[in-house]
A protein has these predicted regions:
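Conserved redox-cofactor binding core of oxidoreductases
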Residues: 91-96, 124-144
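Glycine-rich FAD pyrophosphate-binding loop
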Residues: 22-44
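Dinucleotide-binding Rossmann-like beta1-alpha1 core, especially the glycine-rich loop
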Residues: 46-126
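Proline-centered flexible-loop/turn and helix-kink motifs
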Residues: 24-26, 76, 128
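N-terminal Rossmann-like FAD-binding beta1-loop-alpha1 element of flavoenzymes
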Residues: 3-30
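Short low-complexity, flexible loop/linker segments enriched in glycine and/or proline
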Residues: 44-46, 131-132
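Proline-glycine-enriched beta-turn/loop adjacent to the NAD(P) cofactor-binding site
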Residues: 11, 34, 47
Length: 144
């Protein structure tokens, strides 16, 4: 049989590429070494969907945000659970506080709205089992 596209690997990336290309009039073959798709790295991945605040690179941040929306839409379409659980980053020294503020300001400049700096008390209220001396926290609501 003739194929227009051959995809090697049936992990999350390979399957996503196959899905997107299936929207066009193409004959697609996906080859996976395991007995089923998503059995290798995709099976044990942390499954965190970031909101674009992690990076200082504007382009990567934009792609992360677009990816978030695509993943959320795909989950709804295929009835896959998708839950925004948020991400808490903490600083225990002055340099860490500086980095959190830098990340916060960078995220705000890129239009990421659901992100906030937290005081030590707010961090402990959110995560009362934290076992380090926290100076400040950064909370991103849109991380899933």
């Amino acid at each position: 049989m003739d194929y227009d596209v051959l995809i090697l690997g049936g992990g999350i990336v390979g399957c996503t590429v196959a899905y997107e290309l299936s929207k066009y009039n193409l004959n697609i073959a996906l080859i996976e070494k395991a007995s089923d798709i998503a059995e290798d790295i995709s099976l044990i991945n942390t499954s965190v969907v970031y909101d674009g605040s992690e990076t200082t690179n504007k382009t990567i941040s934009e792609y992360e945000r677009k990816g978030c929306k695509l993943i959320e839409e795909a989950c709804k379409k295929f009835n896959v659970p998708y839950k925004k659980v948020g991400a808490l980053r903490v600083a225990s020294d002055d340099y860490g506080v500086f980095k959190l503020k830098e990340m916060f300001n960078s995220a705000k400049e890129r239009g990421i709205e659901k992100i906030s700096l937290l005081s030590k008390e707010e961090v402990i209220e959110l995560e009362n089992n934290i076992n380090i001396d926290v100076k400040q926290g950064l909370y991103s609501e849109d991380v899933a």
